[in-house]
């Protein structure tokens, strides 16, 4: 997967107006894909072979937009170790006004993991997805056994073997295993992410929302304005589902007849409130499974400051950001000291 960018936005030319309470609302405007309301039923032989139960409650597609941004839970390292657990299981999620039944980490929006260079990440990964009902095809490169899983620390400079960041490991439903990833002392600080990387099931699981951010702290520590800024994590995803409001077949991910839209942290076009003079650091994670995303702030400008932890020599001002799957972006947003109306 490709890697991403970071942005630093200022209010020079943002065209924002302060409210009576002195709050500035910065709306994240991501164009949605209106590709039809009926979802694809998938391919013969694979349709809902991994469903845990029938009778999922269906709800009409009623877009819900312009709600305050919801951010993931934060889990931090202690004394050089970030020790946590992640559970893979189906869960109901209300996304963009539609109730979906999807594979997930921790039953919804996956936690953000924060650690420092030289520290160790320890995860007990539990697979509580239902048993697979299909067999391995003659060509194992075809999608199969969609409830097998593993975990990948995307972008980390670490060991790919043993119980570290080993994408060749496979965990069948009903099992658990330990992951231990040690970062070197000189590891690049910045925004990373984690996701399944099991060949045959990764796309379906990522499309279901099994993605989370990892922050390796210390980036821009020598720039006080950035170091003091409030961090906000934004996971960019493509929401797609079939007629059962699920993702149960590889074919659901690609046909133009599938219902799909874009989301940030499981929300359609969320809104961020900023006080006059406030600075925020936005960490954007391109965790979509397929398409590039064109991101912009409504009437705002953005300034690129780093690419996947690699700091640029100077800010690069822009109005739009194209993020490919796997890319990450840090974004600093400024608001000026405007007078209340």
Predicted ranges, named:
Residues 29, 39-40:
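Cleavable N-terminal signal peptides
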Residues 43-334:
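Histidine-centered copper-binding motifs that mark active-site loops
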Residues 333-341:
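Residue-level detector of conserved catalytic or cofactor/ligand-binding positions
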Residues 20-21, 283-286, 340:
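Short, cationic motifs built from Arg/Lys/His that form the positively charged side of catalytic pockets
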Residues 1-19, 26-33:
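N-terminal secretory signal peptides
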